[in-house]
Amino acid sequence: LLYQNFGKTSDFTIIDESSKIEEAKTYGDDVVGWVRVEGTNIDLPLIARNNVKDISVGEYEFAWTNSFPDEKSNHFTFISHNIRNVSSNPIIGDDTMTYFEQLMSFIYPDFAKENQFIEFTGPDGETAIYRIYGVALVDEDQSMSYYDTFDEEELDEYIKKVKDESMYTMNVDVTSSDMLLTLYTCTRFYGATTDYSFRVDARKLREGENMKYSTVETNKNYEEISSKMKEGDTNEEV
């Protein structure tokens, strides 16, 4: 099934996040950037986990990486909690959601059609827009978050992996010369005893590239997801 916005251009724009980054630093963690995700309430500082006192700390919300990102990094990966939005029928549009709980909105094709951009401020202080090129529900351990610098062959392999595993086929060109961004959160989509992750992958907008939405087409990877959603499981009480 093909979903298309017929060349519609996103109005998602860059915001100066510097004051929020400085405020986040007052909690004592190693703040390495900021992230906002179009169509969601995800608007969080990014923390280097190696210096985080406690990833379950309740003083403020954040996403974290297990690597040491710097100006040489070419693939950033960040993780954040999903405590409530874990069922096979994720809630969409609930502004009481926290951390990366609203990342699950991308499991719905109509949402992915109309929300395809991420604002990312990196360790060098540069803020840029990234374009989503893959969304996947995967049985993996998020170990990608321990690395942030890759050679050309490794990046080519990862890009192929993302496109092979994505539940959508999106007409976005991605190469090893692009800066990459990966966002992970946990889910119990297939039940409490499984160890699946929900992953959204994006690459930095190229110089002169517009922000027209790409086409979004569900593929064979979405068939099992769609069947599970029809079973009607709801979120657990917390």
Model feature map: region roles:
Residues L1-V238:
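Solvent-exposed, non-transmembrane regions of membrane-associated and secreted proteins
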